Amino acid sequence: MKFRPCIDIHNGKVKQIVGGSLKDAGDQARENLVSGQDAAFYAELYKNAGLKGGHVILLNGKDSEYYEATRNQALKALAAYPGGLQIGGGVCPDNAEDYLKAGASHVIVTSYVFKDGQLSWENLKKIEEIAGKEHLVLDLSCRKKTISILL
């Protein structure tokens, strides 16, 4: 068994949020825990414990007033553990190379390559050209939803 640590960053703070509670409008989420430590603290902790393959996730979108604070926390984590963490949350061709240069081992993409339940091969090719397939993780996250079928 492998432990894969995670650093979720929302509104510039390391948090554990209640699954499915994240709302872009108002930058709101129900919280289980808001840490008093910054993201670099956890990155150092994981590095010192020899835990690789963890990830840093930016939970604020680019339009959020908190985006820069969230992004700065993520960059501090990558600097504290270069090559030890993956990064996700709004990753696209415009920022993938910057995250890799900042120390991310991989970039995680979801919404950039998946639109309306379909894989965009064009977008996948674009991000692969920037990041390289050896540094690219496709996130196939799913969430239980009610499905209505009309007969």
PLM-predicted stretches and their roles:
Residues H10, K15-A25, L100-L151:
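Conserved anion-binding
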